[in-house]
Amino acid sequence: MSSTSLEEENTIVIESTTSSSTTMQTTSTTTTTTKEIFATDEFGIEMLEPTEEMKKQLDDLISFIEKRTELKFAQYPKFQLYTLEGYRDYSEASYLDDFEKDYEEGEWERAVLSENMWGLTTSSPDQMKKLIVEFQRCASAGSYNLLDETLRVPIKRNQKKFNFWEQSVIVHELVHSLQGQVVNLSNWYQVMKDSDDFMNYPGRRSIMEGQADLVQAYWESTLDSYDRQQMNSERPSFSCSVSLPSYFYIPFDLYYGYGGSLIKQVHRAGKMEAINEALFQLPTAEQIYSPEKYFSKEPYVNVDIETLELEEYSFIDKGQLDSLDIVYLLQSKIGQVDAVNAAIGLGGGSWVDYINDKNDLFMTVKIQGDNEQELNEIGEAFMNWANFQSRFTKITTDGNSWNGNLY
């Protein structure tokens, strides 16, 4: 357990008088005061103790959320409070801890190489890791961890009550805590981690964020105009010291933008009961981008792809392709509207990665459209993606067996 030392230097004046002279002596002493730390987390980072006023505020927020969602907490939510810098330190330490556990030797380098190949970045693996660490430090006002089921938010040291901004953030994260208890999100996420298959994550995450945003908006609507202005003034600065690539934010567009739009339609159709039912669904990313496909329950098609025997290359990994992947790959070159339009036509897809002794990566991709027209639109989107990049040379063929463009 660490401590905070506050040093105070005091000057003490002592006067002594004799019959012959007067002498003044000055003595300097140092007093050290040690402040006990309430607790530290698993990384040794200081946590702040909630006051009784804060606990009462949490109780009130929990009651508000239960009323709005029509759901009940099975147990009191776990939470940890930090200073802003402490919260950023936790975000960094947590990411690096997961990084060491999640990536096998060479896996991270291949992941970045794949992004290089698709033209998303020119950064090296080390540079990309530093970017993501900075992103973790500066991108979040609060968090809920799906595995340890703990809510974490930054506050100011020595404050007695949560301010309006902090309460708004806490409402959002408390909704996630409630969702985690109702749906057992911890077990669901652990299964995905164990299988290294996160295909179901984007859709459910979008539903979760949509509901949390809605309840958060309900809470903010209880504030009068003066309190809302006060809340906006209390928002801390979350500036990043580096310029982050635009594609970092593409998944968040899905979760908070398109997901929020879908939740509003679900709410109009069946109120909060319908949203609660949606928490148990596993919608595809395509259904989030296109709500009519959500309501029609259009399925994702599993596409079989052949593993090839390639000279000098060996198989390394395989997986499925979803609509978020399409947008992720294409948006930075052809724009959001065209990328999303192509993604909405995806029936299903698969990919296989191969690697050689020089660590060069080769990928095969197989895509199925919802129909022939949708498949053609996806193909045109990829051709436009290639046309926007000078690294490709276009060769038009008109052969006997097939027509098309090679790059």
Predicted regions and their residues:
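Extracellular mucin-like PTS domains
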Residues: 3-5, 10-34
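C-terminal soluble interaction/assembly domains
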Residues: 359-407
